[in-house]
UniProtKB/Swiss-Prot annotation:
Ranges where the record places region Disordered: 606-627
Gene: SLC5A6
NCBIfam families according to UniProt: sss
Source species of the chain: Oryctolagus cuniculus
Superkingdom of the organism of origin: Eukaryota
Glycosylation sites: 489, 498
Gene Ontology MF annotations: biotin transmembrane transporter activity; iodide transmembrane transporter activity; symporter activity; vitamin transmembrane transporter activity
Taxonomy of the source species: Eukaryota, Metazoa, Chordata, Craniata, Vertebrata
Entry membrane topology: Multi-pass membrane protein
Main location: membrane
CDD domains: SLC5sbd_SMVT
Pfam families assigned to the protein according to its UniProt record, in alphabetical order: SSF
Full protein name: Sodium-dependent multivitamin transporter
Amino acid sequence: MSVGETTSAPPTPAPDSDVITSTFSLVDYVVFSLLLVFSLAIGLYHACRGWGKHTVGQLLLADRRMGCLPVALSLLATFQSAVAILGVPSEIYRFGTQYWFLGCCYFLGLLIPAHVFIPVFYRLHLTSAYEYLELRFNKVVRICGTVTFIFQMVIYMGVVLYAPSLALNAVTGFDLWLSVLTLGIVCTIYTALGGLKAVIWTDVFQTLVMFLGQLAVIIVGSAKVGGLGRVWDVASQHGLISGIELDPDPFVRHTFWTLAFGGVFMMLSLYGVNQAQVQRYLSSRTEKAAVLSCYAVFPCQQVALSMGCLIGLVMFAYYQEYPMSTQQSQAASDQFVLYFVMDLLKGLPGLPGLFVACLFSGSLSTISSAFNSLATVTMEDLIRPWFPECSEAQAIMLSRSLAFGYGLLCLGMAYISSQMGPVLQAAISIFGMVGGPLLGLFCLGMFFPCANPPGAIVGLLAGLIMAFWIGIGSIVTSMGSGLAPSPPNGSSFSLPSNLTIATVTTLMPSTSLSKPTGLQRLYSLSYLWYSAHNSTTVIVVGLIVSLLTGGMRGRPPNPRTIYPVLPKLLALLPLSWQKRLHCTSHCQDLPVDTELFPEKMRNGALRASGDKEPMTEASPVHQGTSPTFILHETSL
């Protein structure tokens, strides 16, 4: 079956008399309320525990003492948004299981951050990922990266709060602004008062709720249609089970190559350089714990993706046996799954409430991460560098005030989203357009020692211009033809680089159209290649400008900010080849300069020498200007 096609016809709608009236029972309201109560209680507990003794490090980085498992679940929850929970099943229902191959990109998409980005960030003892840009380039590049990230996340958090609330209101009659205000206020309170530790532990709780809610739908739905075997048989009979589509054309929406390799760049923009994720790595007790938490996300992501796909298959099998109402058949894609769940779980008190709790757990986890990361970068990148004399107490109060301020801004953005109408789709897509250029900026600095500040700035601007040109062009072209666009840099499971793009992607038609030409051909580039395209633009333009402006002009970059790509690749060769290439001739005899990795506080300030972290084997250390890199490991 080719991508975007399905051999099955939609089930015949039932008469209008069968329209579903989805109402919550008292038990459902209790289950949903417990989610809010427990989330708030976790935040207040961490806020009250040690009140008056908190430090900025505790508030923003959980005092760098978090374990592997909570960090891993928080990494998963951060971009497992509510719209993703609605978007994946709808994608599978409409287009088949081709989307499941996105799971193939998770391996490289998490392996590279674990062994490239985490070691560099962790050993620099950063608080903000954008502090790296100042250490590698200069303060101007740091501010450019920070402002770009703030723009991305401010749009993201308003839409991720409003969109699922709107879908829930349309299906269940749940008051729209009551749910928006309740979620926004609860999330703001526990994030601002409890800091990152509260956010991580509420993410753990909310992740469990998300899994339970989806599992309930799978169990009840498969039982009603005769079991998972029957679900699979029905899907196979109707051509919903997709084979591997090996078409290399990057303009085809979903193929194996697009999902498995284009998705890698999307994952890198999320799990490699996004502040919300980097902050969690840096909160780990040790570098090893940070790496293990990144590994642990892999099976969790596979489970989350598989559950979403299963719900889509169960939904398809269910509607082959039970006719849907006209109201359901005409529903928007972000409402379609909710109609199915309310139809499926009616008469089972508590389960509709559990799924709604699952849905809003996705919203809470993503919004709280946005608040916390925005407060962190604003404090560390825009305020502290200009007010270094700010006391600890003032910094704590300011950090909490920033989180509260971003919470109010989130509510304002939710209101603006409600007024945007069709433009909302463009606002959603902006999040995905920004992820690729930011990834390219970090890769430019980390992998290319010749890159200089002018190259970084011009490269970032070129990447953003290219991203918005193609992304907005795709939206306008699709609107002009009456079709939903293929959103940039999105995927149904994670939205940062995708957000509610998951919902938008499912609106694509199931029939092939004539091939576009000219600029329309460029605008039809698969959204999963956007991160790769835009990050490559930043790197290529950045390198050209850097070379034209003289590179680093004899001022080599700080070796701690460069990832030694060539020595790492040479290390993969057989030992005999390494000896012939003379890449191991003297690496065992050089001394380790522990001063190259002093423990650094915020904004480049160094701790007293007595507080430095001891060095043992394992960390990649560049010995002065020598081209040789030696492996050492910090005792973390």
